[in-house]
Each structure stands twice: as C-alpha cells, then as structure tokens.
C-alpha cells in the first residue's frame, strides 16, 4: 500500500480495519504532547490474538518525520510487543495544531520459528496471495503535561504541599491572603512592643533628668547656705552629701 492509499483512507475505513483478527493495537490514536525543538515518543502495543506467529510491519505517510523501532518484527502467540514511535524535533508548530500524518500497521501469519530478521517485504504482498491484515492509526497533538507545583520547604511533615481548594476553586488565594494577614499581625505586634519599650525608656530618662535637676538645685542651695554660715573649710556633711549625689547620678545614668 502506497502513501497515497494511506491518505485516501477515511474514518469509516479505520473503524472497519480496527476490528482485527490477528493483532490488537493500543492505542489507535498516536497522541504526541507537542513541544517545539523536542523529540517526542509514543508507544504502540501489539497483542497477538492467535496461536500462530504474526509478522508485522509499520508504515507512515511521513517517514522523514518519524522513527519507528522496531518497524518490522514478529509477535509470538498470545503475547504483546511494544513499538516505539518517535517524532523528530519540530521547528514550527502547525497553525491549527492538527496533524494529517497517518500510520498503517500490517500483520500476516508467519511460519513457526520465524525471527524478526527473517521478515521480508514480500510477506506483506497481496499480489503474492498473502492474507494481510491492516490497521490504520491516526496522529493527534495534545497539550504537554504541566510541571508539578514546587513544594514549600516550610510545609509540615505529612501535610499536603498544595493549599486546600474550596468549592469555588479559590482556596490557594485565601491561603495566600491569610498568610499576608498573619505576617502583618505579627509585624504590628512587634512594632507595638518596640513602641512600648521606647516609651518606657523615654519616661525613665525624663525622670532621671528631673531628679538630676532637683538634686542640682538642692546642691546649689546647700552651697549658698554653707557660704553664709561658714567662712572656713568645707563641712563634713557637705562632702558626704556631694558624694551621695554622685553615687545616685552614676546609678541613674547607668540604667539609661
């Protein structure tokens, strides 16, 4: 069967040919998660429904675009064979994301003991009188899988890394808003504590200044009274009072 014959097949032909007697093919649609400049692979599974060896051959309308491994082979009785179809990296994406490429799987009963190396094109020749079973496969493009969401390091062990989703689908937004509110509340609490500490220190400093001023006034008054009452040396009580005032001032200044 030529490439022109493959293109001319309709969906009705596909439905009729999918009811195979020799090989069951899964899937009938080759789905490629299309990405530019990246090779993409898709697996075909061929299951032999008979008690005979079945030789197969895979053909495509666009052989330069796809690599099929193996493209020929033998499926043993009541067994399954995997065929890997790889689409070469594409430089441009189709405008409508539609693919017109098609594949054709041919199957024929083979002699007992035949190997994959012994499969020849003549085995699939209808002109030679061989009964060839054919299954047409379509190619479709699908969206590539999304990358997984990153897991936050701060999540607790055993808990889900994703935020719980409510009925309206906005659970992650609510969790994010709650996170912002909690951070603001903690920041405001820390700010309030800092303000209270600053206020307390300011009040203590003002009290120390007032006490210092009062002691200074009392010291000046004692000096004046001392000058009036005594003309000689410095009285012992005066020296004691000055020393006491110095100790008090030193203690206060150390606290502030």
From Swiss-Prot:
Compositional bias segments (type: Polar residues): 157-169
Q: Which SUPFAM superfamilies match?
A: PapD-like
Which chain regions cross the lipid bilayer?
Answer: 233-253
Positions of the UniProt region annotated as Disordered: 142-169
According to its UniProt entry, the protein's GO biological process terms are: intracellular transport
Query: GO CC: one term?
Result: protein storage vacuole
Q: Does the keyword Glycoprotein apply?
A: no
PTM annotation (Phosphoserine): residues: 149
Q: Where in the cell is it found?
A: Endoplasmic reticulum membrane; Protein storage vacuole membrane
- Point out the coiled-coil segments of this chain: 187-232
Record topology, Cytoplasmic segments: 1-232
Q: Is Methyltransferase one of the keywords?
A: no
Its membrane topology: Single-pass type IV membrane protein
User: What are the UniProt keywords, alphabetically?
Assistant: Acetylation, Coiled coil, Endoplasmic reticulum, Host-virus interaction, Membrane, Phosphoprotein, Transmembrane, Transmembrane helix, Vacuole
What range(s) does the MSP domain occupy? 22-142
- Any idea which residues bear N-acetylmethionine here? 1
Question: From which domain of life does this come?
Answer: Eukaryota
Q: Which residues carry this modification: N-acetylserine?
A: 2
The record's disulfide annotation reads none
Known partners and oligomeric status:
Homodimer or homooligomer. Interacts with the cowpea mosaic virus (CPMV) NTP-binding protein (NTB). Interacts with NET3C.
Assigned protein family = Belongs to the VAMP-associated protein (VAP) (TC 9.B.17) family.
Q: What does this protein do?
A: Part of a membrane-cytoskeletal adapter complex that forms a bridge between the endoplasmic reticulum and the plasma membrane. Associates with microtubules.
Q: What is this protein called?
A: Vesicle-associated protein 1-1
Q: Which species does the entry assign this protein to?
A: Arabidopsis thaliana
**Top-down, what is the taxonomic lineage of the species of origin?**
Eukaryota, Viridiplantae, Streptophyta, Embryophyta, Tracheophyta
